[in-house]
């Protein structure tokens, strides 16, 4: 009996040590500060800027997909023991962060995916938003500041045991875009808003097209998505090369492919892309037509 008790004691001790090690190292991974360099642009407060900010939050950058139509936040993923990901309440209401965050805090979160204290934010598409020009990011921040306060207290983002093991292994690095960015890179000025390839590329970047469909737009598995999630489609000429401009408009506004089948609205936010202007939709179409053909998933 004494021998059995000793063995059990050793086993319990090893398990406790292992769990403690996983917790310590995963916490370090979650909270390791990231340095960045960015000049804060002026924040416009006029009605034109607020309208642009609202448009960006919906039709282009789609902030409302995660933070909710009222920007009051919501649980995005609830999959314990893997983890729970929560998009915070961005307003100044009870449970919101709007009242305690500076304009610089919002800028750092949007363009760099970095939160208070330098910690990397979870599932923040900063590699796309990094491209956002000063006027656009300023307008977006101004709009976020202007929305009515929402009283909504939410649980914190949390990783369970399985998630923490994967954090230590580095398997979840794709969920933290701030870790995979050059935060000192020089940002080119955005092109003028026009039906041009350059403006289409800009919109595809800040709109997250390249975030889901990949840098080359050839599609594939979605970053941070569960293994059983449907892959993003190939948007290169290899995938939609036969689509006309009218086909492209119909897909983004009605959620219907040229063959009449429906796009999956749970993955393709047609309710938001339909709010893009004709100019914006045409510019993106023009850009998509110029990318090199690529086999599916070859980014």
Cite the ranges covered by each PLM segment.
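Interaction-mediating elements
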Residues: 50, 60, 112, 118, ...
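N-terminal type II signal-anchor transmembrane helix
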Residues: 1-35
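C-terminal capping alpha-helices of c-type cytochrome domains
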Residues: 23, 102-115, 128-152, 246-257, ...
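Detector for the c-type heme attachment site
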Residues: 66-72, 111-112, 125, 145-146, ...
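The canonical Cys-X-X-Cys-His
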Residues: 53, 60-69, 140, 200, ...
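Electrostatic cytochrome c docking/interface patches
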Residues: 33-59, 173-205
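Extended surface/linker regions that mediate inter-domain or inter-protein docking
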Residues: 9, 13-23, 132-197, 287
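Gly/Gly-Pro-rich "capping" loops immediately C-terminal to redox-active cysteine motifs
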Residues: 70-103, 120-133, 159-172, 214-249, ...
